[in-house]
Amino acid sequence: RLTHSSYNVLKRIGSIIEYPVFFDHSNGKENLELHCEYMGYYSPHCVENALEMLDLSKAGNKPVHNYSLGMKQRLGLARAILTKPELLILDEPMNGLDPAGMKQIRDLLKMLCQENGMTILISSHILSEIENFADTIGIINQGKLLR
């Protein structure tokens, strides 16, 4: 059961699953505004800022069903950072992104850590990409931490 204190904790955590889910007939901006509404967090600038950070400003007014997989992935990340969380949990954040998109996300994640002090936990099969920016890497095999 969610209480007022539950929302305070949830605002401190952002997350994205491998294939983020949205209301496809709503546009990107509306999806982010809805997320803000049910999280009890809304600032007129937070949605625009998140769209801009993920290079989705122009696409923000287009229905999500017109988005590519990479655009949906970036919209999912925009949703995850809306509340300026302390902890960001990402499952396959590079999924569906082209090399330029991967670099953009890598640079954004570095910036979020350096400028906002955000802790980021990433689950990924693309170890070579994660090694480009992670400061600590753990490898799990059959439920055991190997490294």
Regions found by a protein language model. Name each.
Residues 33, 37, 44-59:
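Conserved ABC ATPase "signature" region
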Residues 63-67:
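Conserved ABC ATPase signature
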Residues 77:
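Hydrophobic anchor residue at the start of the ABC signature
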Residues 84:
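Conserved catalytic motifs of ABC-family nucleotide-binding domains
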Residues 88-92:
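Catalytic Walker B motif of ABC-type/P-loop ATPase nucleotide-binding domains
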Residues 103-116:
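Helical segment within the ABC ATPase nucleotide-binding domain
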